Amino acid sequence: DDYVRMPMGPYAAQRIADSLDCTLPTAYLVDRITEATEGHIDVFPFRPLGERNCQPIVFQDSNNAIKALFKAHGYKFGQLISGLKKDIVLSYKLMTLTDYKHNVAIYGWHYPSGRVLQPLYVRHLDYYVDYSHGVRLIYNKVLIDGVEHDIREVLQSPALYRLLSDEP
C-alpha cells in the first residue's frame, strides 16, 4: 500500500521497456487493451493551474484518487483496469515528421463509455510530464497465427504492422 504512480518521460519509459524486453504500445493497442480490461474507473482530470499538474504533489493526489476509485469499485491492485491514465505511445508521426522528432506521443484516458479523452497528441516536447501520463509495457514477443515474432519487427513490416497500429 506504500507506493505512488509516478509519470515519466518517453526516454525513461523506453529505457525501462528495453531492460524488460518490452515496448510501448501504439494508440491502436491501447484501445484493444481498454476493450479487454476487467473493469473501468472514471476519468478524473485536474484543472491545469500554471505548471501545477507537473508537480509531485499532484502525482500523489492523482494516485490517491485512483486508489479511492479502485476501493469504491472493489478492484484489487494487479487487476487490468482502464481509465487510470493517458498512455505514452509509439507513433509513426514521431518517427517520420521532423517537426516532432523531439516530442512525446500521448493517447488515451478512456471514459467508461469507451470514448477517448486524449486523441493521439504529439505536440508536447519529450521532457514534458504531468500527472495524467502513464506507461504501459508490452512484451516484445507476440504470436501471429501461432508463430512467434518480435513486436518491433512486426511494427516495421509493411505486411503486418496493421495488426498493431491504425496509423498510415
Indicate where each model-derived feature is located:
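Second-shell loop/turn segments in exported
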Residues: 1-6, 19-20, 123-124
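Short, glycine/acidic-rich beta->alpha junctions
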Residues: 5-14, 129
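Conserved hydrophobic ligand-interaction patch in extracellular adhesion modules
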Residues: 10-76
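Generic structural hydrophobic/aromatic packing signal, biased to beta-strands
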Residues: 33, 90, 106, 135-137
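Detector for Asparagine
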Residues: 53, 63-64, 103, 140, ...
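Extracellular C-type lectin-like domains
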Residues: 67-130
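Low-complexity, Gly/Ser/Thr/Pro-rich intrinsically disordered linker/tail segments
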Residues: 124, 128-168
